[in-house]
């Protein structure tokens, strides 16, 4: 019986993951070559796709695994973007070299912001993150060193020709999206992932079993903030200009939340599927103006009512698949 179960269960599952791995490598190879056979407009769109995916994945980690519902997710976007622009312009250093520093600056901000934020919970925490994001927007709006209301251009990219600039930003976005997915998978398969899942299921039970709830949430907060900050920095390399109103816009949070809800909160596959659906809808119906936003809102409501687990849950109802090997099932006797 055990050998039959092994043949019918474990081996096919491993074979399936191997096939998924080969397909993913082929897709990544094709995407890496995109600058040589796609237009600048297509590359700019793909930069948006990869960076917004990373932001949505980070929000999904916070809400789906840490129970941290963030309404002010744009604060990480703004900190990462402004850190990159300020450091690159003021120091005159290649912005690609400064991306790790911008990520580190966002991680430091996340660590410091946890002090007041983690004193709040529930709705107060969600609103508190939005208030903090608004405070940052107002501070940059009145800071002449950061360009005040007019923002600042990314002057350090001016020395590169258009092809090199676009290709460099595109590859940075691709690495950001793939790297975010890799880090999320690595985290969820490790001890931190186990701790977060136990906290998500029951904080009382997790605490009783010896899990440090605050430490687990803090680690997740810093990791998700860093991913979002890096994505924000790369996203604004694509536009070559930052302004307080755009960078700290609530639209970033709205997009991340919509993608996570549509695809499936608490999964790695959900943000991937949600991002694809979001951009298909945007590119197809954005020209309809306010009706487009009404449609997005209605779709989100319908999804939450009829498919609370998102579009990915509709897939798993029909097929038992786990392409990233994150799902943890209870052992069967």
What do these predicted regions represent?
Residues 2-333:
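Transmembrane alpha-helices and adjacent helix-loop boundaries
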